Design a protein with these regions (language model features):
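Intrinsically disordered, low-complexity boundary segments flanking structured domains
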Residues: 25-28, 52-57, 80-83
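C-terminal structural segments of small proteins and small subunits
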Residues: 58-96
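Short, intrinsically disordered low-complexity segments
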Residues: 35-65, 70-72
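Short acidic, gly/pro-rich beta-turn/loop elements at beta-sheet edges
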Residues: 15, 49-51, 78
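Extended, hydrophobic alpha-helical segments
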Residues: 1-34, 38, 42, 46-47
Length: 96
């Protein structure tokens, strides 16, 4: 399933920068960054549960927020890209 994840981490207080880096790293382990605080992830239900648990453990729920947008398996018809940065083919081959 295709999931769009966005986050807002308060960085003005102590520990904020660290939480921000950790949230970004967790997201990067599961998907592709498309904007500063937005990631596209293609995951199965088990991976999604693990991803959510990891992210929730990294944030301070009194100061930070996470949003999960579930676009399902037919996501290609729901996503439109306009402008700079060519879109990344989530299901294509990955060369490291």
């Amino acid at each position: 399933m295709f999931v769009l994840i966005s986050y807002d981490v308060a960085t003005t207080e102590e520990g904020g920068q660290r939480r921000l880096r950790r949230v970004a790293k967790v997201c990067k382990d599961y998907g592709q960054r498309v904007q500063y605080s937005v990631f596209e992830c293609i995951v199965d239900p088990a991976q999604l549960a693990k991803l959510k648990d990891k992210l929730i453990s990294e944030i301070d729920p009194k100061k930070d927020s996470l949003r999960f947008y579930y676009l399902g398996s037919n996501w290609q018809h729901r996503v439109e890209h306009v402008g700079a940065k060519e879109p990344f083919d989530q299901e294509g081959p990955l060369i490291v």
